[in-house]
Swiss-Prot record:
NCBIfam families: Glp_gephyrin, molyb_syn, PRK10680.1. It catalyses: adenylyl-molybdopterin + molybdate = Mo-molybdopterin + AMP + H(+). Catalyzes the insertion of molybdate into adenylated molybdopterin with the concomitant release of AMP. Binds 1 Mg(2+) ion per subunit. Pathway: Cofactor biosynthesis; molybdopterin biosynthesis. Gene3D superfamilies: MoaB/Mog-like domain, MoeA, C-terminal, domain IV, Molybdopterin biosynthesis moea protein, domain 2, Molybdopterin biosynthesis moea protein, domain 3. One of its GO terms (molecular function) is molybdopterin molybdotransferase activity. This is Molybdopterin molybdenumtransferase. Keywords: Magnesium, Metal-binding, Molybdenum, Molybdenum cofactor biosynthesis, Transferase. The keyword Protease does not apply. Its cofactor is Mg(2+). It comes from Salmonella typhimurium (strain LT2 / SGSC1412 / ATCC 700720). One of its GO terms (cellular component) is cytosol.
Length: 413
């Protein structure tokens, strides 16, 4: 059962722990060609079918030698050539060297490859101008990956760092966890679609676009259900429709004090819901629970609050549900602030900041300016969150603070 936290403010860490403890990763699997696997999560371990490299080969353009042939300190005649895809054929006469190119198989008996920059051409052959040690400039079979080794475990997110490795193993396709299906809608009579004229008291629905884009960035399958008016019957129908299609249902708006009475009644009828007041700023109103078939996350209506709670809570939830074993909790680091930061003790505060190097080369952070929960431009101006502890008050320039650099959801790395 969920605990009810409406009487107090729940710490972010507690909320995240409660959420993730309930989530079991999806088990449905798809087999896709590598070109369609970018951003997908491996469903099974990748075991190497072969050694990489598959044979001893040269790491340099140069000359393959036997170390004993160099003891007389005389030029060595060139007995032949070896290229990538065209190895040296035949016997290798004693007292000679073989011209070899990068990636070419080293001939049997080769003990070292001498780079061409450490040689001189003479009428009698090739003179070697530097000391030579056994094994130099030779890439050994299996040096990178051994046959039967687990290359990537299940739960790995496949990117341009992993997919070329699979191709190098001769693997053409991979088993991946199916995409998480997320149904998304906004609530409120005050919302209007961008491109349409605003009537008195209306605002444009930006939250749904924000969340849709972040869901796409995370590789989810998005079911966009539009704007749902403040009508209990239509809202109930929207939840039933969303629950029938999705693994996760996300709504924006309708979870703040004074807004959620009928929303809460509907959700408690359809599932098991905990409405939380989180001890964070912005983003205090947030809801999480379980409908008949799907998980539910209710985001605040203020744009910055909605984006922040998605980033801090929904992003890790989706990662675990999708089978991603890497931590989705944003990493933090300590830097000095160059700005005065206004803060009232009582809640964990996520202010938007600009992380950059100062004139002396040290990392420092400055504020983006006004930190209102409606100032969404602070995300485009900034590149990090400045994370101020719950008990902390105003911060003066030069004090140490924690920052979370934005990841790709907000244009970061």
């Amino acid at each position: 059962m969920f605990m009810e936290f409406s009487a107090g403010l729940m710490p972010l860490e507690t909320a995240l722990t409660q959420m993730l403890s309930r989530i079991t990763p999806l088990t449905a699997v798809e087999t896709l060609p590598l070109v369609n696997c970018f951003g997908r999560i491996l469903a099974t371990d990748i075991v190497s079918p072969l050694d990489v490299p598959g044979f001893d080969n040269s790491a340099m353009d140069g000359y393959a030698v036997r170390v004993a042939d160099l003891s007389a300190d005389k030029p060595l005649p060139v007995a032949g050539k070896a290229f990538a895809g065209q190895p040296y054929q035949g016997e290798w006469p004693a007292g000679t060297c073989i011209r070899i190119m990068t990636g070419a198989p080293v001939p049997a008996g080769c003990e070292a490859v001498v780079m061409q920059e450490q040689t001189e051409q003479t009428d009698d052959g090739v003179r070697f101008t530097a000391d030579v040690r056994c094994g130099q400039n030779i890439r050994r079979r299996g040096e990178d990956i051994r046959q039967d080794a687990v290359v990537f475990p299940a739960g790995t997110r496949l990117t341009t760092a992993e997919l070329p490795v699979l191709a190098s193993l001769g693997i053409a396709d991979a088993q991946v966890v199916r995409k998480v299906r997320v149904a998304l809608f906004s609530t409120g009579d005050e919302l209007q679609l961008p491109g349409q004229p605003l009537e008195a008291g209306q605002i444009y629905d930006t939250n749904r676009l924000t969340i849709h884009l972040m869901l796409q960035q995370l590789g989810c399958e998005v079911i966009n259900l539009g704007i749902i008016p403040d009508d209990p019957g239509k809202l109930r129908a929207a939840f039933i429709d969303a629950d029938s299609q999705a693994d996760v249902v996300i709504s924006s708006g309708g979870v703040s004090v004074g807004e959620a009475d009928y929303t809460k009644t509907i959700l408690e009828e359809l599932g098991e819901i905990a409405f939380w007041k989180l001890a964070i700023k912005p983003g205090k109103p947030f809801a999480f629970g379980k409908l008949s078939n799907s998980w539910f996350c209710g985001l605040p209506g203020n744009p910055v609050s909605a984006a922040l709670t998605f980033y801090q809570l929904v992003q890790p939830l989706l990662a675990k549900l999708g089978g991603n074993t890497a931590s989705a909790v944003p990493p933090r680091q300590r830097v000095r602030t160059a700005s005065r930061l206004k803060k009232t003790p009582g809640r964990l505060d996520f202010q938007r900041g600009i992380l950059q190097r100062s004139a002396n080369g040290e990392l420092e952070v400055t504020t983006t300016g006004h930190q209102g929960s409606h100032i969404f431009s602070s995300f485009s101006l900034g590149n990090c969150f400045i994370v101020l502890e719950r008990e902390r008050g105003n911060v003066e320039p030069g004090e140490w603070v924690e920052v979370e650099p934005f990841n790709a959801l907000f244009g970061g790395l």
